[in-house]
Design a protein with these regions (language model features):
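Membrane-embedded beta-barrel scaffold of Gram-negative outer-membrane proteins
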Residues: 20-28, 229, 235-241, 264-327, ...
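Outer-membrane beta-barrel transmembrane strands
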Residues: 2-38, 86-117, 128-129, 160-187, ...
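Structural signature of outer-membrane beta-barrel domains
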Residues: 4-5, 30-36, 97, 123-129, ...
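Extracytoplasmic loops and strand-loop junctions of Gram-negative outer membrane beta-barrel proteins
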Residues: 1, 6, 82-91, 156-163, ...
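Gram-negative outer-membrane beta-barrel transporters
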Residues: 112, 182, 290-292, 316-402
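Surface-exposed loop/turn segments flanking beta-strands in extracellular/periplasmic regions
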Residues: 44-81, 130-161, 256-262, 299-316, ...
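Surface-exposed extracellular loop regions of Gram-negative outer-membrane beta-barrel proteins
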Residues: 6-10, 22, 37-42, 47-104, ...
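Signature of Gram-negative outer-membrane beta-barrel scaffolds
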Residues: 89, 115-231, 248, 253, ...
Length: 402
């Protein structure tokens, strides 16, 4: 079961400072609370499967009745002479978050041809991740070994925190300036922006339980473009941009509390050029593009069959280089006032350029299937020349509107 509630509240403000100057702002709050359910510990399977060999076994199902019967008659005198200890339970993986933000833009009409815009974007977010006991499946308590503050195990009941419990914060501040110039057959556009992002992390299941803060990371972006109308039917356009993207928190503060010494921004340089043609009954747009990604970071889940979900291992890839090139064409025609035909084709070649460094992160388990920690192994991954996956590089579309 997945469950989540995410309310959003906006306060909008608009002000005309003069005939040429306008200010628009939005102050917002976004909350969130929810998660998903699953098993935790050693839950019985039918037919029974020993240890962690279930992922390579023949088909099986959860034996809920067998697990409830086992937990209902499992007195462990080391912890209680009367209550039953559950060996497998149901858990909730929960996520709670609060985000506050402000976006404000000032528009100024310099002349009939030139418009300028200046803006800021501020937001701060706090996120809590944890797991909690959802159902003891017939038992009275469960013994969890994930908290370093309880090395001999912590007795937990319904609603108690298990497995992991951490809080993160993200503080973002950005500003930009952009301009648009339009006269006769020529339209020019340009923008520049700067931003900073700062992360913090606190692991409540560590002995120190301290807040770990990373230094602010700064990024920039610059974009420009032009369009020229040759006549009433044909126009040419070109765009170019340089964008820096700060790394995600997993590549800045690691799960063990270590802070990366000098995390690199992802960056890319992108350019495109194309032509538009439009007549009374027919329109077509064609463009070619080239994007060079530098120092890209990717996080990949690995299905190894280890753990309770089968995909708990993660690879953090850093320093990825990619080259994206392609051709895109969109066309439409109005065959009749009641019939419109649309078509599109996209032909791309997206490949990795060079190999990448990666950290392979996997859970550690005890004999009862409880998560007791994490281990990380460094690898070099051979990516050079491979196609970029999870993204369609050749696509066709055809549609009709009647």
């Amino acid at each position: 079961e997945n469950f989540f509630h995410k309310p959003l509240v906006n306060l909008n403000h608009y002000l005309n400072l003069s005939d040429k100057m306008r200010l628009s702002s939005v102050l917002y709050w976004s909350g969130g609370s929810g998660g998903g359910t699953g098993t935790y510990g050693s839950v019985s399977r039918k037919p029974a499967v020993e240890g962690e060999g279930w992922y390579a076994s023949s088909p099986w199902t959860w034996d809920w009745d067998g697990e409830i019967a086992q937990n209902s008659a499992n007195v462990d005198s080391a912890f209680s002479d009367t209550e039953n200890r559950s060996t497998g339970i149901l858990r909730n993986s929960i996520n709670r978050q609060d985000t506050y933000g402000l976006i404000s833009k000032l528009n100024y009409d310099v002349s009939d041809e030139l418009e300028l815009q200046v803006g800021i974007d501020w937001r701060t977010a706090g996120i809590e991740h944890a797991r909690e006991v959802r159902d003891l499946l017939g038992g009275d308590y469960y013994l969890d070994f994930a908290d370093d503050n309880s090395p001999d195990g912590k007795r937990v009941g319904l609603g108690d925190i298990i497995a992991y419990h951490n809080e993160t914060t993200v503080d973002w501040l950005g500003g930009f300036v952009q301009g648009n110039y339009s006269k006769d057959n020529l339209n020019l556009y340009g923008m520049g922006g700067l931003s900073s992002i700062k992360y913090s992390y606190q692991d409540h299941f560590s002995v120190a339980d301290k807040v770990i803060e990373a230094d602010a990371i700064y990024a920039a972006q610059f974009k420009g473009g032009a369009m020229y109308d040759i006549d009433d039917n044909v126009s040419l356009f070109a765009n170019i941009g340089y964008v820096e993207k700060p790394p995600i928190m997993d590549n800045v503060i690691y799960f063990d509390g270590t802070v990366a010494s000098d995390p690199n921004n992802e960056s890319f340089i992108s350019s495109e050029a194309g032509v538009n043609f439009e007549s009374e009954r027919f329109a077509v747009k064609a463009n070619v593009y080239n994007t060079d990604w530098k120092d890209r970071n990717l996080t990949k889940a690995v299905t190894t069959g280890q753990g309770d979900s089968g995909d708990t291992d993660v690879i953090f890839l850093t320093g990825i280089q990619q080259k994206h090139q392609g051709l895109e064409i969109e066309a439409s025609t109005q065959l009749h006032k009641l019939v419109r035909i649309d078509a599109a084709v996209s032909l791309g070649t997206w490949k990795f350029d060079g190999d990448a460094h990666g950290k392979y992160q996997s859970n550690e388990y005890d004999d009862d299937g409880n998560v007791t920690g994490l281990t990380t192994t460094d690898y070099q991954y051979a990516l050079d020349g491979l196609n970029v996956g999870d993204m369609p590089q050749t696509s066709y579309a055809l549609g009709a509107t009647i």
